[in-house]
């Protein structure tokens, strides 16, 4: 048993960050930008690469406005055309791939057509796998210039192995998301200790980590940064917007949009190996407003951390308060 697992387990609602002396007059002085790969983005936030969160139209808007994105892989036949379309618009292309045999043919097709995406994400529920490692090696051999993220994982050992195989970043989180029921269906995952898993993985990581899942409040973004995340992947909080995929549904005068997990019945089209669920999320208006609010709250986090940029958050102290911070507020 690795001694990392002797650490106390905790999650986002169990932690409060401790303020430092402020050095800015206004939070507007605080810089939230982050370099990821060869590009710098406005905030360390990326919408989940789920079919109910992102589509081509939203990907274009995000790239045009300085945000990172990862296109989902659930319409595989459209990916090459998507890369071509983004490049023709002068935008970066960021795609997802799996590990099935035909994905190797897809990589070969991209090389043959000279359609190399700037970012590629190997998107597998259990990313600590010999097949993921094989795919990492293949992609880095065929497309050495693509910035390659691999995941998802839960342990320091997994981070080490994927990095050693050639991954440029690793995605941490197995089943903590709102629409994911892996923890209930299988008994495995980081649900309830996602933040502790991130902390453990950051102890050994030599390359960037993406915290994926379990984000419920904007303050959780700052907590993710404190415990080692370079980027924070968010699903349910970035679903339900005007630009989001999914049908608009009205119930008792209230407006909702559909949101579903990537291994749900909706996604799979049949009841088989289901580890996700469908739900309704409140309609939230424009995603631009939500992303701006996330930026402003993160600026406030930086000011509380006593700094001017995200690095200051990584140095603050924290206390474990075990589910008392909500104090009936939510």
Curated annotation (Swiss-Prot):
PANTHER family: GMP REDUCTASE. Keywords: NADP, Oxidoreductase. Its EC number is 1.7.1.7. This is GMP reductase. It comes from Lactobacillus delbrueckii subsp. bulgaricus (strain ATCC 11842 / DSM 20081 / BCRC 10696 / JCM 1002 / NBRC 13953 / NCIMB 11778 / NCTC 12712 / WDCM 00102 / Lb 14). Pfam families: IMPDH. Catalyzes the irreversible NADPH-dependent deamination of GMP to IMP. It functions in the conversion of nucleobase, nucleoside and nucleotide derivatives of G to A nucleotides, and in maintaining the intracellular balance of A and G nucleotides. CDD domains: IMPDH. It comes from the Bacteria.
């Amino acid at each position: 048993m690795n001694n990392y697992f002797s650490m106390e387990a905790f999650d986002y609602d169990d932690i409060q960050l401790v303020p430092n002396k402020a050095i800015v007059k206004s939070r507007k002085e605080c810089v939230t930008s982050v370099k990821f790969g060869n590009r710098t983005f406005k905030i360390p936030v990326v919408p989940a690469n789920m079919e109910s969160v992102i589509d081509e139209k939203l990907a274009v808007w995000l790239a045009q406005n300085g945000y990172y994105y990862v296109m989902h892989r659930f319409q595989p036949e459209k990916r090459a055309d998507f890369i071509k379309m983004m490049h023709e618009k002068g935008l970066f292309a960021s795609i997802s791939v799996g590990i099935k045999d035909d994905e190797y043919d897809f990589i070969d097709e991209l090389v043959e057509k000279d359609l190399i995406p700037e970012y590629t994400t190997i998107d597998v529920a259990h990313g600590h796998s010999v097949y993921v490692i094989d795919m990492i090696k293949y992609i880095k051999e065929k497309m050495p210039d693509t910035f390659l993220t691999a995941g998802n994982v839960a342990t320091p050992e997994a981070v080490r192995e994927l990095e050693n195989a050639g991954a440029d970043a690793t995605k941490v989180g197995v089943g903590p998301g709102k629409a994911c029921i892996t923890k209930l269906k299988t008994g495995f995952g980081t649900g309830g200790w996602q933040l502790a898993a991130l902390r453990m993985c950051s102890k050994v990581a030599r390359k960037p980590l993406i915290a994926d899942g379990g984000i419920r409040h904007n303050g959780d973004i700052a907590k993710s940064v404190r415990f080692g995340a370079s980027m924070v992947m968010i699903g349910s909080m970035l679903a339900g917007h005007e630009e989001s995929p999914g049908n608009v549904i009205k119930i008792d005068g209230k407006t909702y949009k559909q949101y579903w997990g990537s291994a749900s019945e909706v996604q799979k089209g049949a009841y088989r190996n289901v580890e996700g669920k469908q739900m309704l999320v409140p309609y939230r208006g424009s995603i631009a407003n939500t992303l701006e609010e996330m930026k402003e709250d993160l600026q406030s986090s930086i000011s509380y951390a006593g700094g001017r940029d995200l690095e200051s958050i990584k140095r603050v102290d924290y206390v474990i308060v075990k589910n008392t911070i909500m104090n009936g507020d939510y």
